[in-house]
Regions:
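A short, exposed loop/beta-hairpin motif centered on an aromatic-Gly-Thr core
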Residues: 40-53
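General beta-strand recognition
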Residues: 33-36, 45
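Short, charged, surface-exposed hinge/linker loops at domain edges
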Residues: 1-26, 32, 52, 56-112
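Short, contiguous, helix-prone interaction/anchoring segments in small proteins
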Residues: 27-29, 38-39
Length: 112
């Protein structure tokens, strides 16, 4: 299974995060690859490769980046294309790329 998903907004802690540009996500077998505007890319393994499982993993990851975590404990989940890149630094760069792409954050119970 291989497909490209485009994410324009996502829910995080009851808030809808709207993006300026959609994020491209390549799903191939059990790996979800996130690609930033700078073409930085990293993959996350998904044990539940159903559509629902993949969707949950994507939303969890975007929410995680949005909230600003770049903890070393999470690095085991990330597989980097460039093994020479400092994973903590790259996670921070990815987070900054996501944050610079946020257009608005609206409580989910408000009508937009």
């Amino acid at each position: 299974m291989e497909k490209i998903l485009k994410v324009k907004s996502f829910l995080c802690d009851g808030k809808r995060v709207n993006l300026i540009e959609p994020i491209s996500i390549l799903v191939k077998n059990n790996i979800v690859n996130f690609v930033t505007a700078e073409n930085s890319e990293y993959g996350v393994y998904v044990s539940d490769a159903t559509e629902e499982g993949i969707k949950k993993k994507i939303i969890a990851r975007l929410c995680y980046l949005y909230k600003g975590f770049a903890e070393v404990t999470d690095i085991s989940l990330l597989m980097f294309l460039d093994s020479y890149t400092d994973p903590v630094l790259l996670t921070g760069m990815l987070r900054n790329a996501w944050l610079s792409n946020i257009e608005s954050v609206v409580p989910e119970n408000e009508k937009s």
